[in-house]
Regions:
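Conserved AMP-binding/adenylate-forming core of the ANL superfamily
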Residues: 2-44, 48-52, 69-74, 125
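Conserved AMP-binding A3 loop
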Residues: 11-13, 144-172, 180
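Structural core segment of the AMP-binding/adenylate-forming
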Residues: 28-29, 56-126
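Conserved S/T- and glycine-rich ATP-binding loop of Class I adenylate-forming
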Residues: 37, 54, 85, 143, ...
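Conserved AMP-binding loop of ANL adenylate-forming enzymes
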Residues: 39, 165, 177-191
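Short hydrophobic alpha-helical segments of the AMP-binding
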Residues: 47-55, 61, 166
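Conserved short alpha-helical elements in the N-terminal third of ANL/AMP-binding
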Residues: 53-57, 172-178
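Conserved pre-ATP/AMP-binding loop-to-beta segment of ANL
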Residues: 130-148, 154-155, 184-191
Length: 191
């Protein structure tokens, strides 16, 4: 399996197909290259799918701390220029409070956890059930990856990396730990 979380398991094929469907939905809603996609989700397979879907449209996934209060959420989603936000259903009341303050957001996607769907939002499962997979597109190592800091000394700040730089850094870290991995991104492309 590619991902296991509780009782939910995704094969590599299912993971790729779900992400391709979510990516097509994002694209259909005007989210594309360099667009930011907020992930206000618990650790889950859906978090991984939404994260990968953002990459598939050459977008930038934005990590959102589920403990944030309304003012912190508004700050982070506005500061990051998020154009789509995936959120756990249990946070629908928080989303309802902040939604009008975030006019840049084109699509709100609610993951069903038993909470009624918030008006104006799209149900994650409906996106999966009703969207055809997006065809693969060529991405490059200069695409941006951004991680927001924890905000321990003030409000969180986005730290930007290129995909290539991030992967090369991870390869060097693994190599330093004694793991047999390719030397760099160029070696991966040749395998």
């Amino acid at each position: 399996p590619a991902a296991i979380c509780g009782d939910s398991t995704l094969s590599w094929k299912e993971y790729d197909q779900e992400a391709a469907k979510v990516a097509q939905f994002l694209s259909d809603n005007g989210v594309g290259e360099d667009s930011k996609v907020g992930l206000y989700l618990h650790n889950s397979n859906q978090y991984l799918v939404a994260h990968y879907a953002a990459f598939k449209v050459m977008g930038v996934p934005i990590n959102v701390n589920y403990r944030y209060q309304a003012n912190e959420l508004i700050y982070l989603l506005d500061n990051s220029d998020s154009e789509a936000v995936f959120y756990q259903g249990c946070y629908a009341n928080q989303i309802k409070k902040i939604r009008d303050e975030l006019p840049k957001v084109k699509a709100w996607i609610q993951y069903d956890d038993g909470t009624p769907l918030l008006e104006g939002s799209h149900a994650y499962q409906d996106v999966i059930n009703n969207t055809a997979p997006m065809p693969r597109i060529e991405r490059n190592e200069d695409n941006i990856y951004m991680l927001y800091t924890g905000g321990t000394t003030g409000m969180p700040k986005g730290v930007m990396y290129t995909h290539g730089g991030f992967v090369n850094s991870m390869l060097k870290t693994l190599k330093g730990m004694g793991v047999d991995v390719p030397e760099d991104l160029a070696d991966i492309k040749n395998t």
